[in-house]
Amino acid sequence: MQFWQALPMMHPDEMLELAPVAEEAGFEGIMLADHIFAPETFDSRYPYSEGGEPPFDGTTPFPEVFATIAALSQITTRLRFLINVYILPLRHPITIAKGLSTAAIFSKNRTVLGFGAGWLEEEFDCLSIPFA
């Protein structure tokens, strides 16, 4: 059985502290969340909670996931890194390929990517990308 540690919505300093501890404890990997940003207020309904309220707000840090993997991979030796989920429609395919390949190089191929369509309409609006 494999166990993964979720680190979404954590401050980057806490991620750096927790990654080596998770590795020492025998976890298989770390899961990271992806958002370009979290707006201060939004009307979008969070689909993964009963009341539609997300577990984050506009003050929550969302460091760029490929850079985060590169950093965490330098202080661990075997942990895998899962982006759960990468919001595909918000980026150009070449940018995705570049970021993913860079993370794979720095992590020695310990990067796993889960794609998703996204749920936060305000994030799309900010980038002038149609939400459909």
Labelled PLM ranges:
Residues 16, 35, 43, 85, ...:
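A generic "cationic amphipathic patch" detector
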Residues 31-32, 82, 114:
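Conserved beta-strand positions in the central sheet of alpha/beta enzyme cores
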Residues 23-24, 70-78, 100, 104-111:
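Acidic (Asp/Glu)-rich catalytic clusters
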Residues 1-75:
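N-terminal beta1-alpha1-beta2 module of alpha/beta enzyme domains
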